[in-house]
From Swiss-Prot:
Naturally occurring in which organism (per UniProt): Mycobacterium bovis (strain ATCC BAA-935 / AF2122/97)
Basic and acidic residues: compositionally biased ranges: 106-115
Protein's recorded name: Sec translocon accessory complex subunit YajC
TM region positions: 1-21
Keyword Transmembrane helix: yes
Keyword vocabulary terms for this entry: Cell membrane, Membrane, Protein transport, Translocation, Transmembrane, Transmembrane helix, Transport
Keyword Cell membrane in record: yes
NCBIfam families in the cross-refs: yajC
A single GO BP: protein transport
Amino acid sequence: MESFVLFLPFLLIMGGFMYFASRRQRRAMQATIDLHDSLQPGERVHTTSGLEATIVAIADDTIDLEIAPGVVTTWMKLAIRDRILPDDDIDEELNEDLDKDVDDVAGERRVTNDS
């Protein structure tokens, strides 16, 4: 009986971990389902492989993505990771500007030894 009493807290802790892990997984799955249900043609998305594309058409389980002007490919809906928001485009432009500034500063600090 004593061994059972010592083992009971361990079981409760493990049960709690399992409950919270499954709850988090369920929430993530529901968020993915909600995203896939809310997609509309014309929106920009990221795929799970990192590709950025524009939605052209949506079917039950598939989605047509334009990856370059005039280039349309068909993907499973499950391959869509997230929607690209207009703020993301602004952030990318800001990062490019910052990279140029860093390159300019790095170029000014170069020291050459011309003897």
